UniProtKB/Swiss-Prot annotation:
It comes from Shewanella loihica (strain ATCC BAA-1088 / PV-4). The keyword Oxidoreductase does not apply. GO terms for molecular function: rRNA (pseudouridine-N3-)-methyltransferase activity. This is Ribosomal RNA large subunit methyltransferase H. The gene is rlmH. Its EC number is 2.1.1.177. It catalyses: pseudouridine(1915) in 23S rRNA + S-adenosyl-L-methionine = N(3)-methylpseudouridine(1915) in 23S rRNA + S-adenosyl-L-homocysteine + H(+).
Amino acid sequence: MKLQLVAVGTRMPAWVTTGFEEYQRRFPRDMAFELIEIPAGKRGKNADIARILQKEGEQMLAAIPKGNHIVSLDLPGKNWTTPELATQLNRWQLDGRDVSLLIGGPEGLAPACKQAANQSWCLSALTLPHPLVRVLVAESLYRAWSINNNHPYHRE
């Protein structure tokens, strides 16, 4: 199974790139973790946010291979504990499809992305900056993988 993180934004601070890549490299070859960055629409005082969201959503959906299981990261989503995420990761593996996780930009995900999603995951009830979410998702998924594989990374 391949994990694919599709995220809005292309110029992240160095600490975001370093943090994400640290967890990305820890995944085994049979569970590659790929990052696809979608350019953020230009935002300004008179920006048409609905149009920007629509365009970002179209680009995100176009980046997802047909047949992938799509998980949106969104506040109304399911809030999983770490063991529940490990169970979910195992289910995704057993399903046999690759998984695409969607992270929106400053205004969140486009409605089209939410509608296309097979599942919705609420990482936290807190409002988090979208660059930080990349690192949190990578770490959370690596921790879930470590639980499923009896790796000593996770401690109860």
